[in-house]
Amino acid sequence: AASDVYKRQSQVIERDGKFYWYVTVEHKDIPGKSIGVAVSDSPLGPFVDARGSALITNDMTVERTKIYWDDIDPTIFIDDDGQAYLYWGNTQCYYAKLKNNMIELDGPIVHVDLPRFTEAPWIHKRGDWYYLSYASEFPEKICYAMSRSITGPWEYKGILNEIAGNSNTNHQAIIEFKGDWYFIYHNGGINPTGGSYRRSVCIDRLYYNEDGTMKRIQMTTEGVQ
């Protein structure tokens, strides 16, 4: 109900046995990019529109910028207390709390001030630290900030991943699996037609320093096994 085309830049998250898919869409009535949400009983789908309307539309963020593509790249994080947060943005980073139903905002949209933020926010937590990673500048590197609270204030920590091969763009995810941490990103390594918008998914190991900061990613051709 919210869109005609441009379904990309998305994330699926599970809550109470339901799978919620947050996705960037092109709104059919309100100019600019929007964020919609669909729901399914399975991560494989089928997904159906959970609201009948967009969750975020471009007219909700005009105070910060007049561009029509700032409302993209949604990511969801459910904190230890059960509160869910939606982060998103291009050139400007935003967050908002979600209600328990996962399809309505529960409070105002908040702007997050990050150095040289371009797009692709991602939240993860390790111990008592929250990490906000994002694509920075163009061509895009992945940078990150840390905080003791998911709502900040955020302390910038620098570059996590340099420009990936043959790609001006990048978009990351950071996950823990069986006690190890992994950095998921893309490059343009597909031969012979790979590039910024024909991308290969890459996975490499992520390591932490004793103070909780993250070590710079060592990109490999082989990935992980």
Predicted regions located by residue number:
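Loop/turn-rich, solvent-exposed surfaces of beta-rich toroidal or solenoidal domains
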Residues: 116-154, 158, 167-170
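Hydrophobic core segments of beta-strands in well-ordered, beta-rich domains
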Residues: 8-31, 66, 73-94, 122-136, ...
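Structural motif
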Residues: 30-36, 92-99, 140-145, 192-203
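Short, small-residue-biased leader/transition segments that mark boundaries at the very start
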Residues: 1-6
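Short loop/turn segments immediately following beta-strands, especially the blade-tip
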Residues: 38-45, 97-105, 144-152, 207-214
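Surface loop/turn motifs at the tips and blade-to-blade linkers of beta-strand repeat domains
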Residues: 65-69, 111-116, 162-165
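Asp-box/WD-like beta-propeller blade repeats and closely related beta-sheet repeat scaffolds
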Residues: 30-78
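Beta-propeller fold detector
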Residues: 48-55, 106-113, 155-161, 215-222
